Curated annotation (Swiss-Prot):
Biological role stated in the UniProt entry: IF-3 binds to the 30S ribosomal subunit and shifts the equilibrium between 70S ribosomes and their 50S and 30S subunits in favor of the free subunits, thus enhancing the availability of 30S subunits on which protein synthesis initiation begins.
HAMAP family registered for this protein in UniProt: IF_3
Family of the protein in this entry: Belongs to the IF-3 family.
Name of the featured protein: Translation initiation factor IF-3
One GO process term, biological-process aspect: ribosome disassembly
An annotated Gene Ontology molecular function: translation initiation factor activity
One Pfam family of this chain: IF3_N
One Gene Ontology term, aspect cellular component: membrane
Naturally occurring in which organism (per UniProt): Chlorobium phaeovibrioides (strain DSM 265 / 1930) (Prosthecochloris vibrioformis (strain DSM 265))
Location within or outside the cell: Cytoplasm
Keyword entries, A-Z: Cytoplasm, Initiation factor, Protein biosynthesis
Gene designation per UniProt: infC
Assembly: Monomer.
Record has Nucleotide-binding as a keyword: no
Top-level division of the source organism's lineage: Bacteria
Amino acid sequence: MKKQKVTSQKQKITYRVNEQIRVPEVRIIFQDGTQKVMQTAEARRMAEERNTDLIEVQPNAEPPVCKFDNLGKLLFKMAQRDKDLKKKQKTTTLKELRFHPNTDKHDFDFKTAHLEEFLRKGNRVRATIVFLGRSIIYKDKGLELAERLTERLSVVGNRDGDPKFEGKKLFVYFEPDKKKIDAYDRIRTKTGKLAPLPDEPEEDGENND
């Protein structure tokens, strides 16, 4: 049996369409979310009347699940989605800024403003809290700073896991959250708070993820 094939990012997806669907009945999922089990021949007739294709999307269901859609447009959307995903994966960068347990308010505000901006641009960020000399005995201060960072950056991102100690460094990772970023940008635009950031600190680091 001839099948229409398309390769997605993770797996090969094979669709049966129109006359390729040989089962006696199918479950149709309509665009409004309603469902109906009907004879396959009737479903094909409906597809023709709608000038669209009958596409089997869940062949292992009982009965198989189909929908009415334009196969060419569906495959194009999937190819475009995979292309966008690949592009996003290639351009995602890990941005890093360093702090100390006793980082003062000015330095904290300055650096977290940059971390916010990195997240707004879709980058992952890492805040590295460095314990110099014997300051490692003040781990609690480092963890408190990590919580302050988490609260400050929660408007545009989410913390990725718990803070992790490695030697005399405490690493805190954050992921951008598109919904939060969109909402945050709307508020900033409305209130006119889109002032340019100062130059980045010299100790900034940048690594490819």
